[in-house]
């Protein structure tokens, strides 16, 4: 956490919002020019994801091959940010503001920081508020709007599920987590990705 804080001058880490197989998400805040607090979310992805993954890779390949494999993984993750850049500003897609790739000092690997707007996940929203008929219709309409934008930009999300849908404080539903999304021109329908149960 100290390394994370030192990499984010001007920002204060408020809390860890959640974690999963792809990394952790933190709430950050900083003072805006009017003295108020500005909040955002920071997705932190480490490559490799754990010491165990590092050790397993090192036991099966050369250091040169491992470095190339890890760089390839960093590039894949960075492509999520580039895809979101093409969709930036749309009201129904999570807005990503910034990305940093920071190499580990003492060993092989990188940390990727993706700063984005702070939102509530759909499952958390439903637990706290429930869903009216009107909000279900709005959810459907907002997701159709997000998917139409993806189609216009030749992007296939490939992992739409409640955990990848977010809600703004104004009740706007947004599609996020484009970690397995790809430009459709370079994929085939035979590629199997995403969450199996969805």
Stretches with model-predicted labels:
Residues 151-167:
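Catalytic-loop of the protein kinase fold
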């Amino acid at each position: 956490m100290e390394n994370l804080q030192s990499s984010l001058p001007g920002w204060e880490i408020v809390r860890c919002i959640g974690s999963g197989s792809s990394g952790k998400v933190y709430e950050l805040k900083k003072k805006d020019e009017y003295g108020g607090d500005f909040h955002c979310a920071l997705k932190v992805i480490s490559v490799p994801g754990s010491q165990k993954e590092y050790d397993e890779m090192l036991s099966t390949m050369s250091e040169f091959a491992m470095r190339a494999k890890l760089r390839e993984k960093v590039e894949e993750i960075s492509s999520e940010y580039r895809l979101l850049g093409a969709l930036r500003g749309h009201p129904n897609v999570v807005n990503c503001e910034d990305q940093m790739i920071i190499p580990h000092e003492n060993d092989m690997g990188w940390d990727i920081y993706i700063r984005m707007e702070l939102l509530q996940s759909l499952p958390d929203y439903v637990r706290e508020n429930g869903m009216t008929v009107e909000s279900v219709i709005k959810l459907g309409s907002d997701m159709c709007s997000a998917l139409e934008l993806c189609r216009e930009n030749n992007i296939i999300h490939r992992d739409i599920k409640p955990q990848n849908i977010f809600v703004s404080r104004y009740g706007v539903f947004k599609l996020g987590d484009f970690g397995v999304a790809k430009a459709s021109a370079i994929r085939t329908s035979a590629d199997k990705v995403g969450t199996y149960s969805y």
